[in-house]
Amino acid sequence: MTEIVKVREQLQISLSDFQEQASLQSGQIFVVGCSTSEVLGERIGTSGTMEVAEAIFSELKQFQEQTGIELAFQCCEHLNRALVVEKELAMKYQFEIVTVTPVRSAGGALATYAYHNLKDPVVIEFIKADAGMDIGDTFIGMHLKHVAVPVRTSVKEIGSAHVTMATTRGKLIGGARAVYAAKEETITCR
């Protein structure tokens, strides 16, 4: 089995396991950070390839078609972890669009591939995604809503890259009288 075929298979299993647990709904935002260098067993930022990026991008697009989620592709630290998204998504949520073109050496291979293969791509600086996937320890946490909830899948690596996934939940707020699950005794004023 070639490395690319293995990466595709691992990604398919990981996304399927994730969806089974997280139940993402149409319209929710899914952020992806990825080091294609780490996927190939190299140090982050040193050996990214468009071939690996294409394989990962195409699997993520299939996941999007199956679930109706919106994708956001995180750039590398050289672009302050900005995100490549469809312009329609940026306009819908009034995300501020910034002017930059991701390239493999400043943006990363996956974000660059996404920028050149989405319908109408733009780059934004900030997002609060409903869920996400981090391939190669790229640190997507800054782009997740509070509170991040880790989701464990049967896949621990994509290629040679460590993979983590998370969904989010609303904060539990309040003090001593706060109630988090409605019960008969908490609804009435007796």
From Swiss-Prot:
Recorded coiled-coil stretches: none
**InterPro entries noted in UniProt:** Antibiotic_NAT-like (IPR028345), DUF436 (IPR006340)
Q: Which domain of life is it from?
A: Bacteria
Entry's family note? Belongs to the UPF0340 family.
Name of the protein in its database record: UPF0340 protein BCE_5442
Question: Lineage in the entry?
Answer: Bacteria, Bacillati, Bacillota, Bacilli, Bacillales
